[in-house]
Amino acid sequence: YAIWDDHDYGHNNSDGSFKFKNTSLNVFQQFWPNPTNDSLNYYTFKKSDVQFFMLDDRYNNEQEKTVLGNRQLDWLKKELAASNANFKFICIGMQAINPMSTKECFYKTNTEYKTLLEYIQQQQINGIIFLSGDRHHAELLKVQEKGMYPLYDFTTSPLTMYPIKIGKKNKEFKNPYRIDHTYYPNYNFRKISVTGDFKDRKCLLELKNKQGKVIWRYEIKKMDLIAKP
């Protein structure tokens, strides 16, 4: 399974105006045998009590006005509401929820982010965790929205590109939404394990370096991600 981001799709930070986007879509879908959804590049799949929602943050991107587009956002809302998975991983190329971001981020679309958040609250959808990349470093972000269980965004990258450190003068250097000791500006990848009794499931997030050594671990319990009535 795979999704794309800007460098798989086009040039750096490319959006929906990229003139070769249909060529990119055709090549990507020929290379990756993903489940298709109306010939577009987003889909969902489930393994046991875990479901993944794989998003396209490029094809309909309008530089922070929209990232997903109405059609994909409506699809995501419908699929989330229909899911009975204990953990629901929303996977997106760019970071999802970083209020301090100086780069591309779904949170900065404002309207799409708020629309999705309001829907999650209204439908009392449990178990959502975001998985993202793009930033050339790793970190785990935690955002507490009003009336909502904590939202996590587990960002990893790079695996093959060069790492980039956040400068000390950058407002993200001391990001208050970053969980302590999770920032890692070197080659990395993640491992996710879901274990435990079905009524008391636990999700273990692990960050590893390029040799496979664990850099840090963080556990999230099913009961930590229950929507409030």
Regions found by a protein language model. Give the residues of each.
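Metal-dependent phosphoester/phosphodiester hydrolase catalytic core
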Residues: 1-229
